[in-house]
Amino acid sequence: NYAGGNPGLMQSLFSNPGMPGFPIGQLRLSDPTPPLAMFPEKFSPPFRQAEYTFARGFSSMLPQLRTPYIQTWTFGLQREIVRHTVVEVRYVGNKGTHIWHGFNLNEVNVFENGFLAEFLNAQRNLAINQAAGVNSFQYRGLPGQVPLPIFDAAFGARGSQPALPAASGFSNGTFLNYLRQGQVGAFANALAGSSIYLCRMVGNQLPACARLGFDSPGPFPINFFQANPFAAGAAINLMTDYSYSSYHGLQVQVRRTYSQGLSFTANYTFSKSLSDLFADSPTMTRNYTTLRNRRLDKGPSPFDLRHVFQAYWSWELPFGTGRRWATGSSVVDKIIGGWTLSGIVRWQSGRVFRLSSDRFTVNQNDSGVILNGLTTKDLQKMLTVRPGPNATVFFVDPKLIGPDGRANPEILAPPTTPGVFGQFIYLYGPSLFLPDLALSKEIPLTERVKFDLWVTALNAFNHPSFEVGGVAGSVSIMSTTFGQTTATATGPREIQIRLKLSF
């Protein structure tokens, strides 16, 4: 299934402005349709990767992919503290090895190829040009400016192909924003994935570019941005067994066996679960932040629940004939007697989520956030639930929200330094509280006929428990609804009444 999206018997036709025969901004309704490019041009298995460049990525798996396994160890103490009641304290640990992890091998490179240095020069050129009233990062020979050979190649003429207009190059609004925001990774990814730009840089050295009509070589190698240029701008997903996990938990349980109409079990777990795979499925593709340092991804597992308390019980209420409190009236005792109250209560700390910024200052993966003047522990304390507008709730302190609805940049800001990641911060959302109660009674009619009555209240107190991010979720500080949620982890109160006649 992982490789099921690989190229097969499918062709696509397309035409983009800037491709050969389709000059940008020069097409009129009366003009003939620009020439269409076809990918692949023909089917002749085995399919060559080069036939799918600029069209789609590929997926594969390690030929020696191993089966994941978990090692578990535990020890505990158990003691009866009073009659019918036992306390057990236990430590449980486990370690997951060879966990399957699919990720993209085609990470964009901005370091060894000199693109980061050119990006910094482009930022400086832009600042100088804007001071002169020109909204462009092109080299204009002004004091302090330097030539930009990479961008000149990406936007300039190549063989018979003309140069791109300023709006598609040095004055492009998206590119200007990348420079202002320090998003060198986003800029590199935009150039690497576009035949319009990459083919002007590498020319007909890349077969896909030659097929598109580029008829001369370019000054840069075809793998300038990505290790596998035949999947330019796309992913080369590899399923591996590189990931791991660990779990350590302290469990305390109190059990009472049935005695005098009461039995119960209550347990509490304090635990910590870590992994380098922040995903809810091992077959889900989850890119490493950077292949240069896979240790950056070690953090809480998406299933990390630090505190969990559960209790369930059954209590025969002490009313009626033969019970502690009897009235002496057979009619009254039949009404108030024979009732059993039971329930299940669960309380747990919130699910973990990761803060993101939608900024790409290193590669095509999120670069994290910048936390100013606070520690992660301080930030966690500022998570609290309060009513919000339009049936939403806020799960953060109002101080964390700016006037535009995004995170307050004085506390939480996006990274802006090209080539440098921010902080990768994991937080825990609102806690969950779920009480389910039931009241039951056996009503004998004759020696052989009886009624059983059950009244069950799920989420008995109608207490909403809100969810943030979902399993393996992230929350963007750049969202205009930062700190808001409408998702609930539990449903509303539900009352069920059942009757059973036995004879």
Question: Over which residues does each language-model region extend?
Answer:
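Short, solvent-exposed micro-motifs at the edges of structured domains
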Residues: 11, 17-22, 27-73, 78-503
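Active-site region of glycoside hydrolase catalytic domains
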Residues: 7
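ATP-dependent adenylate-handling active sites, centered on carboxylate activation for C-N bond formation
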Residues: 1-4, 89
